[in-house]
Amino acid sequence: MNITILGAGAWGTALAMSLADRHSVMLWGRDAAVMQEAEQRRENTVYLPGFRLPDSLSLSSDFSAAIAHVGTDGLLLVATSLAGLRPLAMQLQPYAIPNIVWLCKGFEADTHLLPHQIVREVLGNDIPAGALSGPSFAQEVAQGLPCALAIASDNAALRELVVSAVHGPSMRIYSTDDVIGVEVGGAVKNILAIATGIIDGLKLGMNARAALITRGLVEITRFGVALGGRTETFMGLAGMGDLILTCTGDLSRNRKVGLGLAQGKKLEQIVTELGHVAEGVRCAQAVRSLAAERGIDMPITNAVAAVLFDGDLPREMVGRLLARDARNEMA
């Protein structure tokens, strides 16, 4: 199968490596210099250093060539950041693409839209579209370590296409039609990972970490169901699975934000050290606003947003959460 991946960051590169042994894969990146160096060195030294790119993997900075590679029956995967999704979708408007599947997570900063809403707004409703999400660190995928993801789409044929293309020896793909649930799970877990990083950075113990992750799952579910997702989706890979990985994994950028905040660092310093803004930072403001508009109780999200944007100290965040009134666990 012909597969084009738009976005040569760590995740796009890792997925391209995983698929190149059994498909004709082209990885497109916007920066011609980065792609030329990757072609010459057979290594993406900027975004995924230390991993040799398969000889069978094609690299390009030519957008038209990358889209042409998909053909009429291939698969188009978008591995940009959420901030890059709308500009890329607009760039796709002149082309006849057979489908589109995105890997980004979050809510758009200005509009508070989910990825599927952005794609539909720009490209319309006729193109088969879906979200590929779940617990996945790029470095582990590049190593060929086991991984499981979920493809969410309201188009059954696209779900089958993605499963047949991406499912492989070290990667299992499950399918669902709950696009909203999968996208909300992938977005809100980043906020909770910041909170978990704060808990760990303050050395409050594993009991506190477990409590926060568990109550965080309740919070994700409450929010996601209010937006139209299904409860069971949040018990799966894009909910509980992604939440556990992002909150506990040492490779988690969002957890690193929380650790830095607990150490007294300013957000600007943390972002500089990371090299880019972690999605949870962008997402916290959007989710706080959406929850307030809809009257959804989001105590952990609100506490994280207060630390990020309102000047609250990390210990104040913890104190505020512990001071909440007792309640039924499922409330």
Swiss-Prot record:
Annotated positions binding sn-glycerol 3-phosphate: 105, 134, 136, 189, 242, 252-254
- Annotated positions binding NADPH: 11, 30, 105, 138, 253, 277, 279
> Which is one Pfam family of this protein?
NAD_Gly3P_dh_C
- Enumerate the UniProt keywords alphabetically: Cytoplasm, Lipid biosynthesis, Lipid metabolism, NAD, NADP, Nucleotide-binding, Oxidoreductase, Phospholipid biosynthesis, Phospholipid metabolism
GO function terms (MF aspect): glycerol-3-phosphate dehydrogenase [NAD(P)+] activity; NAD binding
| Record has Repressor as a keyword | no
Q: What is its EC number?
A: 1.1.1.94
User: Sorted alphabetically, which Gene3D superfamilies does this protein's record hold?
Assistant: N-(1-d-carboxylethyl)-l-norvaline Dehydrogenase, domain 2 (1.10.1040.10), NAD(P)-binding Rossmann-like Domain (3.40.50.720)
Q: What is its main location?
A: cytoplasm
The active site lies at 189
Pathway as given in its UniProt record: Membrane lipid metabolism; glycerophospholipid metabolism
EC supergroup of this enzyme: oxidoreductase
The record ties this protein, via InterPro entries, to:
6-PGluconate_DH-like_C_sf, 6PGD_dom2, G3P_DH_NAD-dep, G3P_DH_NAD-dep_C, G3P_DH_NAD-dep_N, NAD(P)-bd_dom_sf
A biological process term (GO) from this entry: glycerophospholipid metabolic process
What this protein catalyses is: sn-glycerol 3-phosphate + NAD(+) = dihydroxyacetone phosphate + NADH + H(+); sn-glycerol 3-phosphate + NADP(+) = dihydroxyacetone phosphate + NADPH + H(+)
> What GO cellular component entries does it have?
cytosol
Is-annotated flag, keyword Amino-acid biosynthesis?
A: no
Known PANTHER family for this protein? GLYCEROL-3-PHOSPHATE DEHYDROGENASE (PTHR11728), GLYCEROL-3-PHOSPHATE DEHYDROGENASE [NAD(+)] 2, CHLOROPLASTIC (PTHR11728:SF1)
Q: NCBIfam families, alphabetically? A: PRK00094.1-2 (NF000940), PRK00094.1-4 (NF000942)
Family as reported in the entry's similarity comment: Belongs to the NAD-dependent glycerol-3-phosphate dehydrogenase family.
| Entry-linked HAMAP family | NAD_Glyc3P_dehydrog (MF_00394)
User: Tell me, what does this protein do in biology?
Assistant: Catalyzes the reduction of the glycolytic intermediate dihydroxyacetone phosphate (DHAP) to sn-glycerol 3-phosphate (G3P), the key precursor for phospholipid synthesis.
Put simply, this protein is called Glycerol-3-phosphate dehydrogenase [NAD(P)+]
Which species is listed as the source? Herminiimonas arsenicoxydans
Q: Which gene encodes it?
A: gpsA
